[in-house]
Amino acid sequence: MQMNKAVEMTDPAKSLEDMVLDHHRSQLALCDRLERLADSLPDKYDPQECLSISWQLYPAVKSAHKFEEEELFPKLLEPGQSRGDIEKSIERLKFEHWEDESSAEDISMFLRQMISHPSTTDIGKMSYMLRGFFDGIRRHIAFETEYLLPKLREIQ
């Protein structure tokens, strides 16, 4: 069983960019685990891995989003910074955060249900939810990497 801990919110020894990248790595590792789980459905999944993911998913996603909304986004929106379309992009990302957190809660609940009551769980729905979630997280991270991190480098 692989463990993923939520990344520490702030670390004074690290740059803001390094902390963003730490959160990205943590979330991408969870996405890889979710993809392996989706590939193992319907009958080759590891119940312990499901349980582990179910307890780690929401806290990891919430921690990354809290960090972005309290540390990264305010830095990018500081007065005097060249903003361009960044305000619209950040608003969209905040909305995606809400959607991702809601999906993470749903997935966690379904994973626990799948372990405790496998005969009542719609495995096809579970696989679809997992794939939609990890694809969305990966796209979100790719956008932040390609658009927000270069903006952050310009102002640091």
Feature locations, PLM:
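Small-residue-biased structural context
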Residues: 1-156
